[in-house]
Amino acid sequence: MTLNNFINIWIRKKHIVYLCPDKYYEDMFDLIDEINDGKKKIEEIIECTICAFIPDSCDFLVAYYLKDKLADAEVKHFYIGDGYMIVWIEEESEQ
């Protein structure tokens, strides 16, 4: 799945977050600007210093990190790219 295909599929969801290790952090803003210029709105970027994209442990680390940062959100989907990760977040409804 390409980055653009992923965005096209998941942009309809409530919340899309970029999560990336700090060594890629500056580059992510350029990528987000390109996507936002194409009318695909990215809401925020979170700098992640704990996830080294180790395949067997990545989902656990990211879920743990986001649980701490976004207590009222549930991690729904991951897309691991070249040095970055997109996370689809669906906020819990207040019922």
Residue ranges and their predicted role:
Residues 1, 90-95:
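Short intrinsically disordered terminal tails
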Residues 20-89:
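Acidic, low-complexity, intrinsically disordered interaction modules
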Residues 1-16:
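Long, hydrophobic N-terminal alpha-helical segment
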